[in-house]
């Protein structure tokens, strides 16, 4: 019979509660039952006094880390990011692009698609395309030279280059063609976010009804609020 393993720590962030100090069972690398009482018998106890144990963090919007940028298009840089993030408690992430040329974004998507299963630390769960379908009024750090309306053919080229791992894309809902674009890519399993936008409430509603489900840079990269026009 395989020896049971438990980890002791001061605090555990469980599914619906925070408990501790206590012991958490580990079976084949997976967390099991929690108990406040010290396990007895033939068991292995890993002691982490003074430590907190929590599920790994998921970073869904990250452009770079450890002096590396996703838009550098550097496979080794992506690996360095992965290692660095794991040391911060992040166990999975979505490398995030910036607005750039169609060709550059294709290259970046391809590079991440080729390396994502080889990273040594935090796992890559997909790619987040932040842009280029934004508007200039709230461009932030995005380059408006490459802004344009959502284009399914272009997006599918990026998706093909990535090997199908683009999982999220942000756009401005006032751009032409948004409704069809959102409906299509959400049906394909891609999460659509709204951001860097000067849309009215009505324009945003169209995108939400079409399937958009995330808001990016709320209250700073968006139209201002007014008591007669809620933005």
Which residues are covered by each model-predicted region?
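Divalent metal-coordination and catalytic microenvironments
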Residues: 10, 24, 29, 50, ...
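Active-site core of metal-dependent hydrolases
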Residues: 160-231
């Amino acid at each position: 019979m395989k020896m049971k393993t438990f980890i002791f720590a001061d605090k555990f962030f469980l599914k619906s509660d925070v408990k501790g100090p206590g012991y958490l069972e580990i079976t084949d690398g997976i967390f099991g039952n929690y108990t406040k009482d010290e396990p007895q018998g033939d068991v292995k106890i890993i002691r982490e006094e003074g430590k907190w144990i929590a599920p790994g963090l998921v970073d869904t919007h990250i452009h770079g880390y450890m002096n590396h940028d996703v838009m550098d298009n550097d496979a080794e840089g992506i690996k360095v990011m992965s290692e660095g993030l794991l040391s911060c408690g992040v166990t999975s992430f979505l490398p995030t692009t910036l607005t750039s040329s169609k060709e550059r974004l294709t290259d970046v998507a391809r590079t991440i698609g080729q390396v994502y299963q080889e990273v040594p630390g935090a796992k890559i769960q997909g790619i987040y395309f932040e842009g280029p379908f934004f508007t200039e009024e709230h461009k932030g750090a995005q380059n408006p030279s490459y802004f344009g309306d959502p284009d399914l053919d272009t997006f599918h080229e990026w998706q093909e280059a990535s090997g199908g791992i683009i999982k999220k894309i942000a756009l401005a809902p006032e751009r032409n063609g948004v409704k069809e674009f959102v409906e299509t890519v959400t049906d394909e399993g891609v999460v659509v976010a709204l951001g860097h936008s000067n849309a009215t409430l009505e324009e945003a509603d169209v995108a939400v009804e079409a399937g958009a489900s995330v808001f990016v840079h709320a209250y700073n990269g968006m139209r201002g609020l007014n008591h007669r026009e809620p933005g």
